[in-house]
Every structure is written in C-alpha cells, then in structure tokens.
C-alpha cells in the first residue's frame, strides 16, 4: 500500500526549495557584486565578505588537491538521500523533525550546487568580535546548523504517548 505524499514528511520539501532559493540567490548576488576578498560592513560585528571555500566547514581539507570536492559531494548526496527516506517514512505531523531534515537537505544541496558548478563553496557571512573572526559561512551552512540544532532539541522534548498519537 503506497502512502500519499501529503501524509508523509515529504510534505515539508517546500522548505528545501525555500532554502535553495534564498541560499543560491544570496550567492548569486555576492558573485555578481563582490570581488574575491571584498568586505562590506553591515552592522557592528557583521560583514559581508566574499570568500571561496574549497573544503568543508572551517575550510577543513581545503588544501587537499581537489579530491575533497568529490568526497564532500558524495557525502552531501548520501545525506540528502538518507534524510529524504526518513522524511518519507515519517508522518507529516512530525513537524520539527521534518523541518529539520528539510533545512539540512536544502543547505546540503545549496553547497553541493556550488561544489559541482564552481568547484568551491561561496561564503559571505563574516561574524566577528573585536579582532576575532568566526569562520566565514553562508546561508546553506546556517540552514544545516539550524536543522541539526532542531534534531538535538527534538531529542530533549517529551515524546507523545500512544493515546496522544491516536
């Protein structure tokens, strides 16, 4: 017996589309309007700064000769497949988990697009305090982190009883 897509977590795939549009749109604007390394202050402690990341988070493996592009692309594809299956197997009413999965999928696909199209990930958010700068990141990274935090949060929330689920 097949399930209706609307009865599964796949109902929340619109979040993936929203993350992709916002992420890729912001990266397009940076690529069109900034020179590599250019910085524009937005607020105290927050700049727009065009950077290229050839590695993973915090530029992990950025100087590894190119193989990491395909390695991280494979990981992103694998994560997207696993989370999509989890969304299909879950109920549409499990909002927190499905939104979390969709945020992670959207972020992973945004960075995957960059890796495959450009050969690097476009980063642009530079958060700093005084002279200390956090690693430059993008909106896809933010979506992934928020999704992961929601999964952790869900683990601390009380589970509904069988009576409440009925």
Swiss-Prot record:
UniProt keyword list: Aspartyl protease, Cell inner membrane, Cell membrane, Hydrolase, Membrane, Protease, Transmembrane, Transmembrane helix
Entry-linked Pfam families: Peptidase_A8
Disulfide bridge map: none
Leader sequence residues: none
Membrane-crossing segments per the record: 12-32, 70-90, 102-122, 137-157
InterPro entries to which the protein is assigned, alphabetical: Peptidase_A8
GO molecular function annotations of the record: aspartic-type endopeptidase activity
GO cellular component: plasma membrane
Principal subcellular localisation of the protein: membrane
Matches recorded under PROSITE patterns: SPASE_II
Similarity annotation: Belongs to the peptidase A8 family.
Entry-linked HAMAP family: LspA (MF_00161)
Protein name, per record: Lipoprotein signal peptidase
């Amino acid at each position: 017996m097949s399930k209706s897509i609307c009865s599964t977590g796949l109902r929340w795939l619109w979040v993936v589309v929203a993350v992709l549009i916002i992420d890729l749109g912001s990266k397009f604007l940076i690529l069109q309007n900034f020179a590599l390394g250019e910085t524009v202050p937005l607020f105290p402690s927050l700049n727009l700064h065009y950077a290229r990341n050839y590695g993973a988070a915090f530029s992990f493996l950025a100087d590894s000769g190119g193989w990491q592009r395909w390695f991280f692309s494979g990981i992103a594809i694998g994560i997207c497949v696993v989370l999509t299956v989890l969304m299909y197997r879950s109920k549409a009413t499990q909002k927190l988990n499905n939104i979390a999965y969709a945020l992670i999928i959207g972020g992973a696909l945004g960075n995957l697009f960059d890796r495959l199209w450009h050969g690097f990930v476009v980063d642009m958010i530079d958060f700093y305090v005084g002279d200390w700068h956090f690693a430059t990141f993008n909106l896809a990274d933010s979506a992934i982190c928020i999704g992961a935090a929601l999964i952790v949060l869900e683990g601390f929330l009380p589970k509904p009883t069988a009576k409440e689920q009925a």
